Swiss-Prot record:
Descriptive protein name: Protein S100-A11
One example of a Gene Ontology biological process annotation: positive regulation of smooth muscle cell migration
Post-translational modification: Phosphorylation at Thr-5 significantly suppresses homodimerization and promotes association with NCL/nucleolin which induces nuclear translocation.
Function noted in UniProt: Facilitates the differentiation and the cornification of keratinocytes.
Modified residues (Phosphothreonine): T5
Binding partners and assembly: Homodimer; disulfide-linked.
Superkingdom per UniProt: Eukaryota
Length: 98
């Protein structure tokens, strides 16, 4: 039986695979696939953005090799960055309660 961490890893892989490949390459997210992922899986984040260009800038910043798409490692950089931001927010909220 997989551990909670192993299930989380499996889930990240499954989500990446769910969105990648619709434009032909199952090892990468195209810009269209990235936008679909963001608007579906991170809809609250996307809807709260006042700047319409934020997703384009995120894609460019995450695309470390400038090939116009995100591989799994580049995708994980997004997930890691969001996890760090959530963790920092949690810590700030916890410290305010003390």
């Amino acid at each position: 039986m997989p551990t909670e961490t192993e299930r989380c890893i499996e889930s990240l892989i499954a989500v990446f695979q769910k969105y990648s490949g619709k434009d032909g390459n199952s090892c990468h997210l195209s810009k269209t696939e990235f936008l679909s992922f963001m608007n579906t899986e991170l809809a609250a984040f996307t809807k709260n953005q006042k700047d319409p260009g934020v997703l384009d800038r995120m894609m460019k910043k995450l695309d470390l090799n400038s090939d116009g798409q995100l591989d799994f490692q580049e995708f994980l950089n997004l997930i890691g960055g969001l996890a760090i931001a959530c963790h920092e927010s949690f810590l700030q909220t916890s410290q305010k309660r003390i």
